[in-house]
Amino acid sequence: FELSARGRSEMVICSKVRGLEVELITNVFASRRRVAWLLGADEAELHKAFQERATKPLKLRVVPDGPVLEVVEEGEEVNLHCLPLIKHFKHDRAPYITSGIIISEDPETGVGNMSYHRSMVHSNTELATSLHSRGHLWRLLNMVAERGEHLPVAMVIGGHPLFMLAAAARVGADVDERDIAGGLFGEPLEVIRTPHYGIGVPATADFVLEGIIDPQARAEEGPFGEFSGYSSDRSTNNVLRVERILRRRDSVLLDVAGGNSPDHLNLARIPRESEMAQKLKERFPDV
C-alpha cells in the first residue's frame, strides 16, 4: 500500500520475514506493464492479448512427476499451522491464504474448475473458507451434497502468474480454466495427479493441499480485508479438510496483497475487462 500511495508497482521479494521459513513474493500483479510483458504485449494491448490467448485454450498435459511432489506430508504429518502465512490487516481474524486456488473436477463430466477463496487455518487439518461468490465450486458442492458425498478438491498456493490469471477468468461450467492457462502460456499446462483423488494440479506449484470440502461442516472465518477496502465477515464458513500437503523443497510464499491493493484488483480486473471489451466489440464493432 505504501508503494501504491507513491505511484510505484514494483514486485516485492522478502528474503527474511518474521515467522516465515521461506521467501515471500507479493505485488506481482500491481503492474499492468509487467503482466503485459508476460503475454508478450504492450500495456495498451493487455486486454486484447489476454482475450486472444484465453479464447484459444489448450488441453492440459498430465506428467508423471514434478517438483510439487518433492515433499509429501500426510496423516499425522499434516499440520496447517506450519504453512507460511501472513496477517494482512490489523482486523483480520487470522493469517490468511490470499493466493489459494481451489481446483475441483465435475464428478459427471470431469471438467475442472479453478477459483479463488479466502481461507484461514481452523485446525491442524482444516481450513475455514468462504464460497460466498457462489460460483461453479458452489454448484459442484451442492451437487455432491444431494448425493450425501464430499467434494474432493486441491488448493494450489503459488503458481505461475499466468496460471493465476486463468483462475480469475469468468468462463462457463463446461470450460476448464486449466486449459485457459494453457492458452495463456501458448503450450499445455503440465499437471500431476494428486496422490489420492487424482486432481490435476500444476507440476511446478509451490504448495498443494489435497482433501475434501464437507458440505455439512461449518467453521467461522472472517473478518478479512476485502477488495472493497472494508473489512468483511460475510462468509459461507465452509470447511476444507486437508489430508495431505504437497510442496517443493525450494517453495516460496506467493502472496496476493489483500484489500483494494492494485495487486488484488488487477488480478480480477484484467480477465474481466478483457471479457467486457470482447462483448462490446461484438455488439459495437467500431469500438
Regions found by a protein language model. Give the residues of each.
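Extended, highly charged
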Residues: 1-224, 229-239, 244-287
